[in-house]
């Protein structure tokens, strides 16, 4: 027996922060010859403890245990068991330890000691102070190992492992074999020195950390968070970041969705037709000499036996030895096709004597049943009994049937049709293996009928909707009450990620809102502490920066807590004043131009689950993928680093640009320019009107008036203005008009004039002219007013319709502009769409579906095909990672540009020409847009140009001094000449003015200084003959082949937002709205005050006098003026009232008496 020395490493500890059970322990075994390089390795077997028990004594009340015997076993049926004594150990004596053993199915391995002659039934007597480790099978010892007690002074542990049936004594390997079998039972036989602790274990995968060939740390692949993370990425050391993972659960259920609810199957019916043998001769004597014809033997299936020719034959019933004999067949040949079942069936016909022919054929074993028929044949058939062999009997037809009972063969008259009903028992809300309309896979099925039925999906007899990878996304089943829609979801959340912060596994990010989670950006965070999920806590702490892992604006600390990242710059930033409060004067030679500019400031982050993308749910593919090493880790590290940089750069960008609390734009005092909204605003006015007293004392009548009515009211103002009514008449478009309202005074005046004109006939007839004239003028007024009202109604309707059309056009233009922004955003996902489309590519394999490949081919061929898919899909992921890197670099540059635009264009006024819009910058207003910012630049651009003569500078040559030069100072402009005179003007605006001392810089010389160099100093300047372009081109473009990169593999277009045309259209719509202002014919409201009649004023006067008399009577007749005297302030009355009231006193008996006042002494 080959025994390989093994090293036992026992690690009994709590699994740090990722422990699944508080009392978890495990044992890790590996060969001592295994010396891997330093680092983490998925090697060997670990055994996790699943049950712990103890025992103090199993020798009973006897003074000791019996050495050399096996006793005290317990059934375990486990991968491993460890039986350990106390740390001090147990003595090798019958008073403490006797035997320890393990049963591996039919093999038993044990350790014992026995020093008695004829007292050791299994091992025989051993040498003193030696131990025996033996293995036996079927009661026969086939392995013996004798070791000294000096090596093992006491018994401490006995461990059995199914891996190569390894057995360890006190940690040393003492037995192994080439078989791997679970431990069925084990035990320790002892009297004292215990207790013995039994640890039953199950085998799990393990990731071990080796240093110099020795395992220093072990992580169990047991489904715990730490085990899932470590065993999926083959490492136990993780840098801060996010790590997607898949927790594949064991699928125990399976269902099939059939295309048809029922299937009809028509089986083949085999027809056997029998006929009368016309040339058959009478049989010789003896039953064995009867010849058979037309033998038909049925196999499995359905059969029909046609005996139609028997219609001319007469059936002969059984009568002792005569006629038929078929007690084992309860049917006649006429009913043999009535659905009878057989395991075997053979039919043949013969011709023999009716006397005894059938009965002897059955007795002799030639048939199971025999049917006899008479056809009136001659008596030429010989007998079959021993005494009748030479006699002749009537010949008849004999039908032999040989059969056995069963169900392989069934008779029928017509081809049978069997209907199989298919029942779609769909398992919901659990991970299952499915076969949906012939497509197999694994998924989590949910019923989505309520949300999908209203959209008429798959209404035209469709069965399923496939996703980009070719798998079923939604399928429909015809139920009893209509269509039922189901959605296939991944068994596990493909977006779930482990969060590692400070080198520790602290939480999980998932797209599912689970109990105890808290929302971070667009994901839900679940904190993990000691391997368990904790309830969420509110985010209360703010940090200026995050040295750990961050997700958006949230910082995840090593203890799993969440803090909000608020940079200090954002807290101390002072908001600039962006309100426009002053009018900017622009020269007439310039135009105000509005320019829009879109800058992308953020990118969409992606989460890559490399293993899920490449292999899906295929376990075979995942095993094969282990050979590719850390390629997924490299891709993931690139994507994670991009996400981290994106978050930090985006926070820094907003901290340097967006002040705290500045979230609401202030648009007060902003002119609307040519967009006239005066119709929507209240125009302040102070119309001339009468006083409050006039409104109280007069009745006012309002009517629609003309623009001439104001002049009429001014003309008739005054006490006797009604007398000037006709004189104040006005003309409107050549017609004489008067307001249609006539007061009582005017009515009296014109009536009197009319009556007087009729008093003396023709002599006074001219007095009626004023009455007729004013009547015609007022009729003109009414007619013109009605005409203007009708015209204004037409203008209002036309203008309103035009305004509505302009508004609709404006909304359409705005929609197009927003659509272009949306297109920019949608283009960000083009590379993702291309990556997902790669799942449909087979990359040279027979199929793009991994499950189909493994179903169609054997393991070796399938692995070769899947290897092509893995290589192709990894290439797609690499392209995606590279594209995101390039996009991040571009977006970072765009953010830098946006920062400059905000600082220079928004917060200040740029002096750079055409940096903030086109031309000289005036004002910039930023606006949030998807994934970026839209800047609206206001600038002024030249409209006309003046052709002037520019001069670099002046050289001054004084008479008594050396010459010097003057040039314009930086930023002051340039010198120009106009009509023989010299001026200075700004370079960007023509404003010539006299040159002053502050506009110039004095140079010491009028000469320009140059540096003289030769050709060898500046090698970048070459002559034409130094470079032969054709010669250089021929070095590259000759007959040789040069491989150029395939740029189609990386096609990423930088989106550019262009909404200039839409802004122009909106400007046109604004102009159209301005054109829709209604220019109404001016009308006025004429308000005429009518005075009350004279009797009304007389009644008012009488009422006032009566009121005064009653008030005076109350004052004098009450005896005491009461409060009225004081209130009205009538001092004399108050004094008199006071004197009068002192002479009278009212007593309780209501007797009024006069009192004498004493005289005053002076």
Swiss-Prot record:
Specific enzymatic cleavages in vivo yield mature proteins. The precursor is processed into S1 and S2 by host cell furin or furin-like protease to yield the mature S1 and S2 proteins. The cleavage site between S1 and S2 requires the optimal sequence [KR]-X-[KR]-R. Additionally, a second cleavage leads to the release of a fusion peptide after viral attachment to host cell receptor. Residues 19-1095 are extracellular. Residues 769-874 are annotated as: Heptad repeat 1 (HR1). The chain crosses the membrane at residues 1096-1116. Keywords: Cleavage on pair of basic residues, Coiled coil, Fusion of virus membrane with host endosomal membrane, Fusion of virus membrane with host membrane, Glycoprotein, Host membrane, Host-virus interaction, Membrane, Signal, Transmembrane, Transmembrane helix, Viral attachment to host cell, Viral envelope protein, Viral penetration into host cytoplasm, Virion, Virulence, Virus endocytosis by host, Virus entry into host cell. Residues 1117-1162 are cytoplasmic. Residues 1024-1105 are annotated as: Heptad repeat 2 (HR2). Glycans are attached at residues 51, 77, 103, 144, 163, 178, 212, 237, 247, 264, 271, 276, 306, 425, 447, 513, 530, 579, 591, 669, 676, 714, 947, 960, 979, 1014, 1038, 1051, 1074. PROSITE patterns: COV_S2_HR1 (PS51923), COV_S2_HR2 (PS51924). A motif (Di-lysine motif) lies at residues 1159-1162. InterPro entries: CoV_S1_C (IPR043607), S2_sf_CoV (IPR043473), Spike_S2_CoV (IPR002552), Spike_S2_CoV_C (IPR043614), Spike_S2_CoV_HR1 (IPR044873), Spike_S2_CoV_HR2 (IPR044874). Pfam families: CoV_S1_C, CoV_S2, CoV_S2_C. Residues 1-18 form the signal peptide. The keyword Transferase does not apply. GO terms for biological process: endocytosis involved in viral entry into host cell; fusion of virus membrane with host endosome membrane; fusion of virus membrane with host plasma membrane; receptor-mediated virion attachment to host cell. Residues 822-866, 1055-1083 form a coiled coil. The di-lysine motif confers endoplasmic reticulum localization for type I membrane proteins. Belongs to the gammacoronaviruses spike protein family. This is Spike glycoprotein. It comes from Avian infectious bronchitis virus (strain M41) (IBV). The lineage of its organism: Viruses, Riboviria, Orthornavirae, Pisuviricota, Pisoniviricetes. The gene is S.
């Amino acid at each position: 027996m080959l025994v390989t020395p093994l090293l036992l490493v026992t690690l009994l500890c709590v699994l740090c922060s990722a422990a699944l059970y508080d009392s978890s322990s495990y044992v890790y075994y590996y060969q001592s010859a295994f010396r891997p390089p330093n680092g983490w390795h998925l090697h060997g077997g670990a055994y996790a403890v699943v049950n712990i028990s103890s025992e103090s004594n199993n020798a009973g009340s006897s003074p000791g245990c019996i050495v050399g015997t096996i006793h005290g076993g317990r059934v375990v049926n486990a991968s491993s068991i460890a039986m350990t004594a106390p740390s001090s150990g147990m003595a090798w004596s019958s008073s403490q330890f006797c035997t320890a053993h393990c049963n591996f199915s039919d093999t038993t391995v044990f350790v014992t000691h026995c020093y008695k002659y004829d007292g050791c039934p299994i091992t025989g007597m051993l040498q003193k102070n030696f131990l025996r480790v033996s293995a036996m099978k079927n009661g026969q010892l086939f392995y013996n190992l004798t070791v000294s007690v000096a090596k093992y002074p006491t018994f401490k542990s006995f461990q059995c492992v199914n891996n190569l049936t390894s057995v360890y004594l006190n940690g040393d390997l003492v037995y192994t074999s080439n078989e791997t079998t679970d431990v069925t039972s084990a035990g320790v036989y002892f009297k004292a020195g215990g207790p013995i602790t039994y640890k039953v274990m199950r085998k799990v995968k393990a990731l071990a950390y080796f240093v110099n060939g020795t395992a220093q740390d072990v992580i169990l692949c047991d489904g715990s968070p730490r085990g899932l993370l470590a065993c999926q990425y083959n490492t136990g050391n993780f840098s801060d970041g996010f790590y997607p993972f898949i927790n594949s659960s064991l699928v125990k259920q399976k269902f099939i969705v059939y295309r048809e609810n029922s299937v009809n199957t028509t089986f083949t019916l085999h027809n056997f037709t029998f006929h009368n043998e016309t040339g058959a001769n009478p049989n010789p004597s003896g039953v064995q000499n009867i010849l058979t014809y037309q033998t038909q033997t049925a196999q499995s299936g359905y059969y029909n036996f046609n005996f139609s020719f028997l219609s001319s034959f007469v059936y002969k019933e059984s009568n002792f030895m005569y006629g038929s004999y078929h007690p084992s067949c309860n049917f006649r040949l006429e009913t043999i096709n009535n659905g009878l079942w057989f395991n075997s069936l053979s039919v043949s016909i013969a011709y023999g004597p009716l006397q005894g022919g059938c009965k002897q054929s059955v007795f002799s074993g030639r048939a199971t049943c025999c049917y006899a028929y008479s056809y009136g044949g001659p008596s030429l058939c010989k007998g079959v009994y021993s005494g009748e062999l030479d006699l002749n009997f009537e010949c008849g037809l004999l039908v032999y049937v040989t059969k056995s009972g069963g169900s392989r063969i069934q008779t029928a008259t017509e081809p049978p049709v069997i209907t199989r009903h298919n029942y779609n028992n769909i398992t919901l809300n659990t991970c299952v293996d499915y076969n949906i309309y012939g497509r197999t896979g694994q998924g989590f099925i949910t019923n989505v009928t309520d949300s999908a039925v209203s959209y008429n999906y798959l209404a035209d007899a469709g069965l399923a909707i496939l996703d980009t990878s070719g798998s079923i996304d939604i399928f429909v089943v015809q139920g009893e009450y209509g269509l039922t829609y189901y959605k296939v979801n991944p068994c596990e959340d493909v977006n779930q990620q482990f969060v590692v912060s400070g080198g520790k596994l602290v939480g999980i990010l998932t797209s599912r809102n689970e109990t105890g989670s808290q929302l971070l950006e667009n994901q839900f965070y679940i904190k993990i502490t000691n391997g368990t999920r904790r309830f969420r806590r509110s985010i209360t702490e703010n940090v200026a920066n995050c040295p750990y892992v961050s997700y958006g604006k949230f910082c995840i600390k090593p203890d799993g807590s969440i803090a909000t990242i608020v940079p200090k710059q954002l807290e101390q930033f002072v908001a600039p004043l962006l309100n426009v409060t002053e009018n900017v004067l622009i020269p007439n030679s310039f135009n105000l131009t509005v320019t829009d500019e879109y800058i992308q400031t953020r990118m969409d982050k992606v989460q890559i689950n490399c293993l899920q993308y490449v292999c899906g749910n295929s376990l075979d593919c995942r095993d094969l993928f282990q050979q590719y090493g850390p390629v997924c880790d490299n891709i993931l590290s690139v994507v994670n680093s991009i996400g981290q940089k994106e978050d930090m750069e985006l926070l820094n960008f907003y901290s340097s640009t967006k002040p705290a609390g500045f979230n609401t734009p202030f648009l007060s005092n902003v002119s609307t320019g040519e967009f006239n909204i005066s119709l929507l605003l209240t125009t302040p006015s102070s119309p001339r009107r009468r006083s409050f007293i006039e409104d109280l004392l007069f009745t006012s009548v309002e009517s629609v008036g003309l623009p001439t009515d104001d002049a009429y009211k001014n003309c008739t103002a005054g006490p006797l203005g009604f007398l000037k009514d006709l004189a104040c008449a006005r003309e409107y478009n050549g017609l004489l008009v008067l307001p249609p309202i006539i007061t009582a005074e005017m009515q009296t005046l014109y009536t009197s004039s009319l009556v007087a004109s009729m008093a003396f006939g023709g002599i006074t007839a001219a007095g009626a002219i004023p009455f007729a004239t004013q009547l015609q003028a007022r009729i003109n007024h009414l007619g013109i007013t009605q005409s203007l009202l009708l015209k204004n109604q037409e203008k209002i309707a036309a203008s309103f319709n035009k305004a509505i059309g302009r508004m609709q056009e404006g909304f359409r233009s705005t929609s197009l502009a927003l659509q272009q922004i949306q297109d920019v955003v949608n283009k960000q996902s083009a590379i993702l769409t291309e990556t997902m489309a790669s799942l449909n590519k087979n990359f040279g394999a027979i199929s793009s579906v991994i499950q189909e490949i493994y179903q169609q081919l054997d393991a070796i061929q399938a692995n070769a095909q899947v290897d092509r898919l893995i290589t192709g899909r990894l290439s797609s992921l690499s392209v995606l990672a590279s594209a995101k890197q390039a996009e991040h670099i571009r977006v970072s540059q765009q953010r830098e540009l946006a920062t400059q635009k905000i600082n220079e264009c928004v917060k200040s006024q740029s002096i750079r020409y055409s940096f903030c819009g086109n031309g000289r910058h005036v004002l910039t207003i930023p606006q949030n847009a998807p994934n970026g910012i839209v800047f609206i630049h206001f600038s002024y651009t030249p409209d006309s140009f003046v052709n002037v003569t520019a001069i670099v500078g002046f050289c001054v040559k004084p008479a008594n001094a050396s010459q010097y030069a003057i040039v314009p100072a930086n930023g002051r402009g340039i010198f120009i000449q106009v009509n023989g005179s010299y001026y200075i003007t700004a370079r960007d605006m023509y404003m010539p003015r006299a040159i002053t001392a502050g506009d110039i810089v004095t140079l010491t010389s009028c000469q320009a200084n140059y540096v003289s160099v030769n050709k060898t100093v500046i090698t970048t300047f070459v002559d034409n003959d130094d470079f032969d372009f054709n010669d250089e081109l021929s070095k590259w473009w000759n007959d040789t082949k040069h491989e150029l990169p395939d740029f189609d593999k990386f096609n990423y277009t930088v989106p550019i937002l262009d909404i200039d045309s839409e802004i122009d259209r909106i400007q046109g719509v604004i102009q159209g709205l301005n054109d829709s202002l209604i220019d109404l014919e001016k009308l006025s409201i004429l308000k005429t005050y009518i005075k009350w009649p004279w009797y009304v004023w007389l009644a008012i006067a009488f009422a006032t006098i009566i009121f005064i008399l009653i008030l005076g009577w109350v004052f004098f007749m009450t005896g005491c003026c009461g409060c009225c005297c004081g209130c009205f302030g009538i001092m004399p009355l108050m004094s008199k009232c006071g004197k009068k009231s002192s002479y009278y006193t009212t007593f309780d008996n209501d007797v009024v008496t006069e009192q004498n006042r004493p005289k005053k002494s002076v």
